[in-house]
C-alpha cells in the first residue's frame, strides 16, 4: 500500500514536461567501451524501503539524463553509471518515528505540524524525539559503513578504475561522511579527488571531502534538528511555489523526490552534480 501511494505521488509530482524522460536515449559515452566511467551512488535516508530507494535513484537518473545534453563536454564524455548503496531500514533508523509516537504520544503527522510551530513543544521534548536516533554517529551501523566504503573502493581500484560521485539523502549523509572517513583512513587510500559528494537534505554539520549539499528552507525535519544542533548546515535552496507543499505525502518538505520535482532545488542539485562530475573527469583513478 505504501509503495502504491509513493508511486502515485511520484507520477503526480512529475510535470507533463517530465514525460519526455521516457523518450530519452541512453548516454552516448556509454556506447564506447573506452570512455571513462563514473559511478553515481544514491544513498537513501530515514525509513526508506528498498522499493522507495529504487524509485529515488530512478528519479535521479531521469532528471540527470534530461539535462545531460546541456551539461559540460567533460560530463558528456563520461559514461555515468547509477547505482544504489542501500541503507536497510530498521533499528535505530525507525527509532526516530517511534520516539515521536512513544515519548511524545503523538503521530508522526502531528509531529511534523508541531515542529512547524503550530503548537508549543519544549526544546527538551524535541530533543528526546530527534537528537539521538537521527544525528548520533554512534548509532550508525558499523557493518553498513564498511560495506559502503568497500563499494566505493572497488569502483575506484583496478580493474574498474572509475570515479565515484555519492548523492546521499537525509541520514544517508551521515553514512556517507562516515564511509568517506573510513575509506581514507585505511590504506591504500584512493587517489585524491576521485570521490565527490552532493548531499541532499542533510542533518550533518559538514560534507566530507569539501563536498556540496542542498537543504531546503522548507525542510521541517532538518529545521527541527537545527533547532537542537545549531551547527547543522544551513538551508541553501527551496522548493519554490509548488503543489507538493500542500500534499500529504511531501514528508515535511524532506522527500528526495520532492527535492528533484520542485525548483529551484532540482536545478541547484543538478548543477552541483554537474560541477562535481566535471571535477571528477579531470582525475585519473588508476
Per-range role (PLM):
Residues 134-226:
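Serine-dependent carboxylesterase/thioesterase catalytic core
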Residues 20-24:
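Boundary at the C-terminal end of the N-terminal hydrophobic targeting segment
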Residues 54-58, 101-102, 190-286:
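Lipolytic serine-hydrolase domain surface
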Residues 27, 32, 36-162, 244-263, ...:
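Active-site catalytic motif of lipid deacylating hydrolases and related acyltransferases
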Residues 1-6:
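Bacterial N-terminal signal peptides that target proteins for export
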Amino acid at each position: 500500500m505504501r509503495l502504491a501511494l509513493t508511486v502515485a505521488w511520484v507520477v503526480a509530482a512529475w510535470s507533463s514536461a517530465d514525460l519526455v524522460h521516457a523518450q530519452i536515449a541512453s548516454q552516448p559515452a556509454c556506447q564506447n567501451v573506452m570512455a571513462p566511467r563514473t559511478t553515481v551512488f544514491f544513498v537513501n535516508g530515514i525509513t526508506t524501503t528498498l522499493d522507495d530507494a529504487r524509485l529515488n535513484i530512478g528519479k535521479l537518473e531521469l532528471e540527470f539524463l534530461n539535462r545531460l545534453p546541456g551539461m559540460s563536454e567533460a560530463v558528456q564524455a563520461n559514461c555515468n553509471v547509477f547505482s544504489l548503496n542501500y541503507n536497510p531500514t530498521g533499528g535505530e533508523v525507525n527509532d526516530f518515528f517511534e520516539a515521536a509516537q512513544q515519548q511524545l504520544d503523538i503521530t508522526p503527522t502531528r509531529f511534523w505540524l508541531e515542529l512547524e510551530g503550530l503548537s508549543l513543544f519544549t526544546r527538551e521534548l524535541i530533543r528526546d524525539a530527534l537528537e539521538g536516533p537521527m544525528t548520533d554517529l554512534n548509532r550508525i551501523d558499523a557493518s553498513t559503513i564498511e560495506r559502503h566504503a568497500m563499494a566505493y573502493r572497488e569502483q575506484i581500484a583496478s580493474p574498474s578504475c572509475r570515479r565515484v560521485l555519492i548523492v546521499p539523502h537525509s541520514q544517508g549523509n551521515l553514512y556517507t561522511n562516515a564511509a568517506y572517513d573510513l575509506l581514507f583512513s585505511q590504506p591504500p587510500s584512493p587517489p585524491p579527488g576521485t570521490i565527490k559528494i552532493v548531499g541532499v537534505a542533510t542533518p550533518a554539520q559538514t560534507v566530507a571531502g569539501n563536498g556540496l549539499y542542498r537543504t531546503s528552507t522548507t525542510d521541517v525535519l532538518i529545521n527541527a534538528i537545527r533547532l537542537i544542533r545549531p551547527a547543522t548546515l544551513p538551508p541553501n535552496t527551496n522548493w519554490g511555489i509548488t503543489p507538493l507543499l500542500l500534499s500529504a505525502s511531501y514528508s515535511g518538505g524532506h522527500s528526495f523526490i520532492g527535492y528533484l520535482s520542485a525548483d529551484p532545488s532540482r536545478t541547484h542539485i543538478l548543477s552541483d552534480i554537474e560541477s562535481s562530475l566535471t571535477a571528477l573527469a579531470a582525475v585519473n583513478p588508476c
